Amino acid sequence: DDSFVVKALGTGNCENIIFKNSVLWNDFARPMEVGVELRADKVRNIKFENIDIIHSDTGYPLMGIHHGDHAEVSDIVFDNIRIEDTPGAQLFDIRIADSVWNRDNKMGDIRNITFSNIKYLGTDNNDILLSNSRIEGYSEKHNIRNVNFQNININGKYALTPKEPGRNVYEF
């Protein structure tokens, strides 16, 4: 299943978690994930740092935050991530949506997400790696805010800014 995953199945907070200095080979689901089950009051201060994804052939997002419960999700950092063999994958996927794993009848929100120093070194997949990546809130009230991208490098080219506001199509 997911290689590194943060879930919050009970009450209280889920916070101050660091995954670092690791090499991931992923055969099913996502290499790095926060969610889907996020039933705590707060899920915050989660960091994925200095990680190599050397294989993930699932087509799933490489870095994901999937939320469908009531938690306030904030301050999630993906930093110094190197990616190699990942055919068909999305670079990231951040969503608030209903799912079969949700137990709450109230949605939360997602705030302050940082992707920095991400380097993709694969031989294919360039066309969908970013274009299929998405940021998708649930409603105006339950939304995603303050997502930052710094130094995103795809095979030697830096992703700059969205080509069109509101779309996940990036130019190099």
Predicted features and spans:
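Short glycine/acidic-rich loop motifs that flank beta-strands on beta-rich extracellular proteins
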Residues: D1-A8, E15, L24-V34, D52-M63, ...
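Surface-exposed loop/turn motifs in large extracellular/passenger domains
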Residues: G10-K20, V36-I53, H67-I83, S99-G122, ...
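C-terminal effector modules
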Residues: P162-F172
